[in-house]
């Protein structure tokens, strides 16, 4: 992974790779699947969150221009997953940013918990002189192979000589098959959390994990987006699902139709039925972006399908209350990195402006308002702040960076 510094000048675009000391550990962070720039601890400096396959969601805290890995300190290190995606929002209305993360779900042949993770080894296990991948799992507190004798022997023929029958192979533990010495010299990766969920922020950059409802665990989640869809001022969550092409011995992760979850304003969610929402995506959903496609002030969705046509869903039910657009200048016209507090008689909710997130996606950098919003308070990327009244009769409210 690389951190690129923008050193563009007038009429010339130029990015330069940052020296390693600007982001220690980022180059070798692991198998990255997604990233989000967000102020996780509310100190005014934009931090970096990175999702991994076979690893945690890592937090690199921005300490005055240097990204420092504080994953362990934040509590994120406890949850190793096959994380696919990440987006930020304030579903519990407490003024800090929480993070929704997509994972493989609970409707697969894989099962894991903190004491019994699924495991992946990478090393040399025989006389072929080639490094191999070995999947492993727990059975009755013993580590055993996740793959059978036939495919294992095809990859490593020496196992056919060591285990003459299927019964012998099936009765052996992983160290008996590959030796403890070879396993100890291998790269070892684990996943102990397979649920998709929300990392709830304590306001200081510390996190606790809250799984999404069981209906959201029916399939792997990729694109996901916090959005207020029903006009009650509480953030909801929409996610697209499915993965049809695991290795041939594994059934497809294809039990989802996408999932729309209604937020309760306290960080909890309940399922909205597909018949009510009209959001049905039975194929392999990947990218998800939110935008006002028809200019009616309501949030709509664009869904990218793996090997399929782009889908568009227009919102017909949310009460239209207009949108907020921040107007920047220079190299940041959409004011990415701004933090906006929506103020209503029922309380406040924090929202950030992103330039990308979810699963390889970028939503329109506008904020859909609900009818109760009377004022917005903006913390601009440079650190200045301003407060602005909102007219509910205005279709689009535009606020420019103060001079």
Feature-to-residue mapping (PLM):
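Solenoidal tandem-repeat scaffolds enriched in leucines and small polar residues
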Residues: 1-37
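Conserved hydrophobic/aromatic "anchor" residues
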Residues: 4, 15-16, 40, 60, ...
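Beta-propeller blade termini
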Residues: 5, 32-42, 83-93, 102, ...
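Surface-exposed loop and turn segments in beta-propeller and other repeat-based domains
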Residues: 20-26, 73-77, 136-161, 197, ...
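Acidic/hydrophobic-patterned starts of short beta strands in beta-sheet-rich repeat architectures
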Residues: 42-51, 93-102, 231-240, 295-304
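Gly/Ser/Thr/Pro-enriched helix-cap/hinge segments flanking short amphipathic alpha-helices
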Residues: 66, 106-119, 127-128, 135-138, ...
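Conserved, well-structured beta-alpha core segment at the onset of a catalytic domain
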Residues: 69-121
């Amino acid at each position: 992974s690389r951190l690129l510094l923008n050193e563009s000048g007038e009429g010339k675009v130029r990015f330069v790779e940052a020296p390693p000391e600007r982001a220690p550990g980022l180059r070798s962070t692991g198998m990255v699947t997604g990233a989000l720039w967000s102020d996780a601890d509310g100190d005014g400096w934009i931090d970096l969150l990175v999702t991994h396959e076979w690893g945690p969601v890592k937090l690199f805290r921005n300490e005055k221009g240097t990204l420092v890995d504080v994953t362990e300190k934040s509590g994120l290190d406890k949850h190793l997953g096959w994380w696919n995606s990440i987006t930020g929002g304030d579903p519990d209305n407490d003024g800090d940013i929480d993070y929704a993360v997509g994972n493989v779900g609970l409707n697969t042949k894989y099962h894991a918990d903190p004491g019994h993770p699924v495991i992946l080894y990478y090393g040399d296990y025989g006389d072929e002189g080639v490094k191999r991948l070995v999947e492993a799992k727990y059975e009755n507190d013993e580590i055993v192979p996740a793959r059978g004798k036939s495919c294992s022997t095809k990859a490593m023929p020496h196992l056919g000589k060591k285990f003459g029958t299927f019964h012998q192979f099936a009765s052996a533990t992983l160290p008996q098959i590959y030796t403890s010495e070879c396993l100890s010299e291998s790269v070892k990766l684990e996943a102990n959390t397979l649920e998709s969920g929300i990392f709830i922020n304590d306001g200081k950059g510390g996190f606790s994990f809250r799984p999404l409802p069981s209906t959201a665990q029916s399939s792997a989640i990729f694109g996901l987006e916090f959005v207020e869809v029903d006009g009650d001022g509480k953030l909801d969550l929409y996610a697209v699902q499915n993965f049809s092409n695991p290795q041939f011995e594994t059934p497809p992760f294809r039990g989802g139709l996408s999932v729309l979850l209604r937020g309760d304003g306290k960080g909890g969610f309940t399922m909205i039925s597909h018949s009510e929402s009209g959001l049905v995506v039975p194929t392999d959903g990947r990218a998800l972006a939110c935008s006002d496609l028809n200019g009616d002030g309501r949030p709509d969705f664009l869904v990218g399908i793996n090997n399929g046509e782009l889908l568009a869903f227009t919102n017909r039910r949310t009460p239209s209350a207009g949108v907020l657009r921040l107007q920047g200048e220079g190299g940041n016209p959409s004011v990415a990195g701004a933090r906006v507090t929506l103020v209503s008689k029922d309380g406040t909710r924090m929202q950030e402006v992103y330039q990308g997130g979810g699963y390889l996606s970028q939503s329109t950098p506008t904020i859909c308002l609900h009818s109760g919003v009377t004022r917005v308070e903006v913390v601009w990327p440079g650190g200045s702040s301003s407060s602005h009244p909102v007219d509910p009769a205005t279709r689009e409210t535009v606020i420019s960076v103060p001079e």
